[in-house]
Amino acid sequence: SFYLDEEEDKEKILEGVKEALEELKQFTDIGPASVTGSQTEDKDWMNNWKEYFHQFYVDDILIVPSWEQPREERPYTMLLHMDPGTAFGTGMHETTQLCIRKLKKYVKPGMSLLDVGTGSGILGLVGCKLGIDHVLGTDLDPCAVSAVRENMQANHVPEGQFELIIGNIITDSQVQKQAGREQYDLVTANILADVLVPLSPVAVRYLKPGGLYITSGILDQ
């Protein structure tokens, strides 16, 4: 599905979509390939998702949207304020929660963490709260910069404790150089499963001897 603004040439765009579907039908069975349209009310779609993001627990960690006040439904040992903005990472996805639980299990004060695909910075922030001395996050999306910065401020994490690099750690030699090999006690990667295949042999290069690689894949389906 997709949205079109009123100013766009809807007839031309829809005609192009129909032509593309007809071409695709020559190679595979995609069903009737019909195109339907409807009008929708004008909303702030960039922020509409906030209606569905409310506080939740990951074991004894309470994660609260930054625009809400926490409600103690049960005791917690960590409070995390989060606003992912347009970056990935509310913490609600099961794979993110699996990584959070592994961080709780393995983090010791004074450790260092490399978080590949940091998004909103949620895994790095959990690490900071658990006693990680230094987090380096990497991400392809420039939106991660403002998201991480705002979430650091909301959780009183000093700038020197969590740094961020925008770029591809798999292919970008400059990002690889900035990260530095064998520098981290932990590497986390909670990203699309098909990215983990080329990433994993690269990610382990940044671990200290005996370090731990925590990963959880998200299917792009």
Task: Show the residue positions of the predicted features.
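Hydrophobic residues in well-ordered beta-strands that form the structural core
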Residues: V64-P65, G137, T215
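N-terminal auxiliary segments of SAM/dcSAM-dependent transferases
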Residues: S1-E73
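A short, charged helix-loop
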Residues: Y76-P84
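Conserved SAM/SAH cofactor-binding pocket of Class I
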Residues: T86-I169
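Amphipathic, non-transmembrane alpha-helical secondary structure
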Residues: K18, Q97-K104, V197-P201
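S-adenosylmethionine
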Residues: L140-Q221
